[in-house]
Amino acid sequence: MTPVRVAILASGGGSNLQALLDALDPSAPAAVTRVISSRPDAGALDRARRAGVAAVALRDPANPAELLAALGDADLVVLAGYVKLVPREVVARFPGRMINIHPALLPAFGGPGMYGRRVHEAVLASGAAVSGATVHYVDEQYDRGPIIAQQPVPVQPGDTPDTLAARVLAVEHELLPRVVIELAWKLRQGSAR
């Protein structure tokens, strides 16, 4: 059976992309077929090229027509460190087939401007005892779509944004491939949610 075609949207280095590339062996129900970035210098594009995956840098990430053209025939869209808001028209084209990974336990520490180090700084400043990672469906707002899966990460005494980020990222690298594989099986059976 043909694997589910996965398009990755990324703005940074692409470590979650690499986790997916490593997890999706030829027997997997999904394959990364393209990587699209809001930044032409994103490390994710280099990772894609090294893996033989099509890599596209958007000229205008807010342009729905450009993004839809770049997504092409994707069956599943995965936001992995993508910091731009996906245009409404694009979200509407992928109902139940567009997901995001976020480095906190949503709904806490999500929304506009809450990405990367800022999330971990906010978690530590709040005194929270636990952080974690969330995979959720994408809707028209940052980090507000229905939650698919979460995995907690305890905050340790003496944690810094960097130490917490490293432990959360390790969890993201396990959680995202697992969810993508589960969704790919569901898509192959005709249901996404």
PLM segments and residue spans:
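One-carbon transfer enzymes
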Residues: M1-R193
